[in-house]
C-alpha cells in the first residue's frame, strides 16, 4: 500500500524524471510500475518466513529453523534507478523483521525521501531511516558502525571494493551489486530483428546507457557484422532525445555535468583510436 501510494505521488509529480533525467515514458513510468510489483512480491512472501522442523538423520536430535532478523541493515543506492533499487533493498529487509538505514545517492535523493515519508505513516518509529549526503561523510560511518549487521550496496566496482574492506573487520554480511563490462554476443544464426533490438534494449540507450546491467560492447560474427551495425544505427536514428518530461522523448539527460564530461572524454579517446569510427551522433 505504501509503495503504491508513493509511486502514485512520484508519477503525479514526475519526480523520478526530475530526480534522474530519465525519460518519463520509456524509463520513469516502467520503473514506477516495477517498484510496485516488487513490493507486492515481497509482501506476499512475508507469511512464508517462519521456522520449520526437519526429519532428523541423527538419532535423538531435533532439526529446525527459526525466523531470526539480522538487525540493522545499511542500504546504499545509486542514482540511476533510485525508486526501484530503494524498494529492492528496504522491502525484503523489513519483511524479514529488520530495520533499515538507507543512504540515497547525492545526485538523486528525492524519490527515496518521498518513499520514506509515506512509509513513516505505517511503520513503527525507527524501522526505516533515510539520510542523504556524500559517500565519505554518510556512507562510510554507516558501513563501519558497530550496530549495522548487514550492508547492501549497488554502485561502482571501485566503491564496492572499499565498502567490502571497510565492513570486513565486523565480519558482517555484505551484498554488492556492481557495474561491469557486459558484452552482447550475436551469432550468424540469430534472428537479426530480435538481436538488433536486443542491442538497443541491452545497452540501455533509453537510460542514456546508465545502468550496471547495460551492455558495453557487442561481439558480432563477421558474416553478419554489416547488417547488425546498419540495423542498430537505423534504430538509433529513430530514437528521440529530448526533455525527460516530454512524453515523446525516448532518451532523457545524463545525470550530471560531471558524468557528461566523463562520457564525452571516453568518446574523445575512442575518436583518437585509428580503428574506431563514430557511426551515429558524437
Can you say where each PLM-predicted feature lies in the sequence?
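ALDH superfamily catalytic-core signature
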Residues: 123, 158-282
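Rossmann-like NAD(P) dinucleotide-binding subdomain of oxidoreductase/dehydrogenase enzymes
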Residues: 51-194
Amino acid at each position: 500500500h505504501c509503495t503504491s501510494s508513493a509511486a502514485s505521488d512520484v508519477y503525479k509529480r514526475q519526480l523520478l524524471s526530475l530526480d534522474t533525467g530519465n525519460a518519463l515514458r520509456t524509463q520513469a513510468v516502467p520503473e514506477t510500475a516495477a517498484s510496485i510489483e516488487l513490493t507486492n512480491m515481497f509482501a506476499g512472501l512475508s507469511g512464508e518466513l517462519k521456522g520449520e522442523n526437519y526429519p532428523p538423520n541423527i538419532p535423538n536430535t531435533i532439526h529446525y529453523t527459526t525466523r531470526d532478523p539480522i538487525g540493522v541493515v545499511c542500504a546504499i543506492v545509486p542514482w540511476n534507478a533510485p525508486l526501484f533499487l530503494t524498494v529492492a533493498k528496504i522491502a525484503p529487509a523489513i519483511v524479514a523483521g529488520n530495520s533499515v538505514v538507507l543512504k540515497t545517492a547525492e545526485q538523486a535523493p528525492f524519490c527515496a525521501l518521498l518513499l520514506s515519508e509515506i512509509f513513516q505513516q505505517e511503520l513503527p518509529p525507527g524501522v526505516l531511516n533515510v539520510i542523504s549526503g556524500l559517500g565519505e561523510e554518510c556512507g562510510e560511518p554507516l558501513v563501519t558502525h558497530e550496530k549495522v549487521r548487514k550492508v547492501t550496496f549497488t554502485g561502482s566496482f571501485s566503491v564496492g571494493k572499499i565498502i567490502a574492506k571497510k565492513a570486513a573487520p565486523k565480519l558482517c554480511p555484505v551484498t554488492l551489486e556492481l557495474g561491469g563490462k557486459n558484452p552482447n554476443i550475436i551469432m550468424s544464426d540469430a534472428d537479426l530483428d530480435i538481436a538488433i533490438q536486443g542491442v538497443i534494449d541491452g545497452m540501455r540507450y533509453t537510460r542514456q546507457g546508465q545502468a550496471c546491467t547495460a551492455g558495453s560492447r557487442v561481439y558480432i560474427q563477421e558474416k553478419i557484422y554489416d547488417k547488425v551495425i546498419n540495423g542498430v544505427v537505423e534504430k538509433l536514428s529513430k530514437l528521440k532525445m529530448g526533455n525527460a518530461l516530454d512524453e515523446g522523448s525516448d532518451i532523457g539527460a545524463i545525470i550530471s555535468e560531471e558524468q557528461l564530461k566523463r562520457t564525452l572524454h571516453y568518446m574523445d579517446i575512442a575518436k583518437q583510436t585509428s580503428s574506431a569510427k563514430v557511426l551515429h551522433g558524437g
